[in-house]
Structures are given as structure tokens and as C-alpha cells.
């Protein structure tokens, strides 16, 4: 696969890859036989490490970052990188305000955190997407900004999703 990827690289741009990148990447690649998405990430990293036009951008920590991804998270990152203009993902937290006599409703209970259905069609375990988002944020691959987004249409599909309807019923 690396040979295919390197096919577009001019011969004069080939360089010796850094051993602290290539050795662990090949080791990790051998553990990823069941996930094409993870294999693709390792292959791209290996190919980039052998192309002197971009090899300076390859950091040894990238191997361990890929190693901390699930196949679904790799799919999500691939989806986001290929979607034109996809600089945000609508995410909601569903809370219920506790009923009490206070004039200001200060107590609430979290029913669902970090939920989105944007990735449901591409991941194997849609019920884990909020965990995946937390991990991608922990790895600094995504930034979880908390603010009110004005594009309400982006949220309609989420609010009308089966999971949110079921939570609201309970």
C-alpha cells in the first residue's frame, strides 16, 4: 500500500524515513489488519515520512495518536476532512430542569451529553459517538467549543432523532 501511495512522488523527492516514525508505524500497522481506516492513516504517515516535500511535518507522536483511535474515530476524521466547509459539527446536551419551588431553576439533570447524529451513517457504533468525540478532543484532533450556534436547521435532525425522542419519553 505504501508503494501505491508513493507512486505519485517524484523519485528525487524520496528520502530516508525517520526510524522513530517508521519502526513504530510498521509495528502498529501489523495490529490494524482488521481496520482499513486505521491502515490508511498509518500508510499515509509512512508515505509522508518518505517524501522530503512533507517529511518535516511528520512527528513521531503521530504514531501513538493513531494508535489511540478506534476504527470509527478514523472514519469520523476522514469524513470531516473530506466534507467541504465542514468546520463544525452540531452537538447537543439534553438536560432536564429539576422541579422545585425556587424562582430560578438552578438544578438540572443531564440526560444526554455531547450527542450528534452527523456520523450515524458512517460509524459501526453510533451509540459511542459522544465517547469518540471526547477522545478526539482529548487528542486535540477536534476542538469542543461551547457556544450557541445560530444555524438552527443544523439541530433539527438531532432534536428529531430517535435516540433523543426516546430519552424525552422516559
Give the label of every model feature segment:
Residues 6, 19, 23-26, 89-91, ...:
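Intrinsically disordered, low-complexity regions
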Residues 17-20, 111-151:
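Short amphipathic alpha-helical interaction segments
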Residues 57-121:
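Short amphipathic alpha-helical interface segments
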Residues 151-170:
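Short, amphipathic alpha-helical interaction segments positioned at domain boundaries
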Amino acid at each position: 500500500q505504501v508503494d501505491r501511495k508513493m507512486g505519485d512522488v517524484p523519485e528525487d523527492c524520496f528520502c530516508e524515513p525517520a526510524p522513530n516514525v517508521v519502526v513504530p508505524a510498521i509495528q502498529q500497522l501489523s495490529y490494524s489488519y482488521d481496520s482499513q481506516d486505521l491502515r490508511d492513516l498509518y500508510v499515509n504517515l509512512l508515505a509522508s515520512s518518505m517524501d522530503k516535500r512533507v517529511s518535516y511535518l511528520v512527528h513521531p507522536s503521530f504514531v501513538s495518536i493513531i494508535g489511540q483511535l478506534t476504527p470509527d474515530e478514523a472514519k469520523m476524521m476522514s469524513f470531516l476532512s473530506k466534507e467541504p466547509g465542514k468546520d463544525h459539527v452540531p452537538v447537543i446536551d439534553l438536560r432536564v430542569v429539576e422541579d422545585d419551588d425556587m424562582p430560578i431553576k438552578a438544578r438540572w439533570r443531564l440526560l444526554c451529553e455531547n450527542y450528534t447524529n452527523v456520523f450515524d451513517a458512517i460509524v459501526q457504533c453510533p451509540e459511542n459517538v459522544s465517547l469518540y468525540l471526547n477522545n478526539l478532543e482529548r487528542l486535540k484532533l477536534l476542538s469542543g467549543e461551547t457556544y450557541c450556534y445560530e444555524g438552527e436547521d443544523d439541530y433539527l435532525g438531532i432534536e428529531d432523532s430517535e435516540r433523543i425522542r426516546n430519552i424525552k419519553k422516559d
